[in-house]
């Protein structure tokens, strides 16, 4: 069996779900991997990923934890509402990608903090996806 990493395919599928979910896109200016210094709030950033093996006797897969960062304005409610829309976007339709089989997803963390500037609200979401190689 050939092993391959699912992280890039998973990231592409999650971005497609986020960008196609109208209730989210009505609330944010963009979904991006690397926002510009002067990009206006609010927006969603696809953050770090980590992967650990998920193996059985007959298959190889991964548990991939992905971070999603919500950069809101000055209210906690806005960051919470956008964070909720991110979770809705990840679950409103199946994640579609070739070469892998989606097994499960689990919310690991959802929190809103005040950024180091003392004003901006920052939502942090961690979701664990279990993916098998085909």
From Swiss-Prot:
Matches recorded under Pfam families: Tail_completion_gp17
Principal place of residence: virion
Gene Ontology CC terms, in alphabetical order: virus tail
Domain of life: Viruses
Subcellular location: Virion
Coiled coil: none
Keywords, comma-separated and alphabetical: Viral release from host cell, Viral tail assembly, Viral tail protein, Virion
A GO biological process held by the record: virus tail fiber assembly
Subunit structure: Homohexamer. Interacts with gp16 connector protein.
Biological function: Tail completion protein that caps the tail and interacts with the connector gp16, thereby attaching the tail to the capsid.
UniProt name for this protein: Tail completion protein gp17
Species, as recorded: Bacillus phage SPP1
